[in-house]
């Protein structure tokens, strides 16, 4: 979020993010000169959050609601700089980029890891999944790679149809040139979108964690 337009409204924070921020401020007041081990600190915050009552979490949930309202209000009046509009505001009707083989693997094994190690932080779960994938034999990776390839093939057909529908003249002209630049662009976008997918997952995991605790 450090990149891009400095005038863009700050992203909305979850109740858990407000809680972690408060913990960090408390820690700084008590130990102003101490360095913070991030993974250790995150683990302690996660454990403390799980033991909190719904009433204690209430103030952070109120802060999150107020921040969400602030973000939505500011986004209504925000005008992105030229050239950024296309990237920042994606068409909801556009075909969704397919998941990678690793992402499909994570979707299958994440619930198992969370079930076996409920105390693990989101970062530790991601690290464990990365280790598991690296230690998985090439033959065992094949089903995920085949599925990812099929989904990518479908996506390419869908996106070609979507682009042709949106720009009929462009579909007739310069197809060969467009294909070359498209491939390069998609390779770059793949990396960005995998990061987006991981961020989305982290947010989902955070919300799941909060929902589980509220129950």
Swiss-Prot record:
Heparin binds at residues 2-10. Phosphorylated at serine residues. Phosphorylation in both NLS regions is required for cytoplasmic translocation followed by secretion. Keywords: Acetylation, Adaptive immunity, ADP-ribosylation, Autophagy, Cell membrane, Chemotaxis, Chromosome, Cytoplasm, Disulfide bond, DNA damage, DNA recombination, DNA repair, DNA-binding, Endosome, Immunity, Inflammatory response, Innate immunity, Isopeptide bond, Membrane, Nucleus, Oxidation, Phosphoprotein, Repeat, Secreted. Residues 83-94, 161-179 have a biased composition (Basic and acidic residues). The record marks 10-11, 67-68 as: Cleavage. It comes from the Eukaryota. A motif (Nuclear localization signal (NLS) 2) lies at residues 178-184. GO terms for cellular component: chromatin; condensed chromosome; endoplasmic reticulum-Golgi intermediate compartment; endosome; extracellular region; nucleus; plasma membrane. Residues 3-15 are annotated as: LPS binding (delipidated). The modification ADP-ribosylserine is found at residue 181. Its main location: nucleus. Signal peptide: none annotated. Residues 150-183 are annotated as: Binding to AGER/RAGE. Disulfide bonds join 23-45. Pfam families: HMG_box, HMG_box_2. Residues 2-97 are annotated as: Sufficient for interaction with HAVCR2. Interacts (fully reduced HMGB1) with CXCL12; probably in a 1:2 ratio involving two molecules of CXCL12, each interacting with one HMG box of HMGB1; inhibited by glycyrrhizin. Associates with the TLR4:LY96 receptor complex. Component of the RAG complex composed of core components RAG1 and RAG2, and associated component HMGB1 or HMGB2. Interacts (in cytoplasm upon starvation) with BECN1; inhibits the interaction of BECN1 and BCL2 leading to promotion of autophagy. Interacts with KPNA1; involved in nuclear import. Interacts with AGER. This is High mobility group protein B1. The gene is HMGB1.
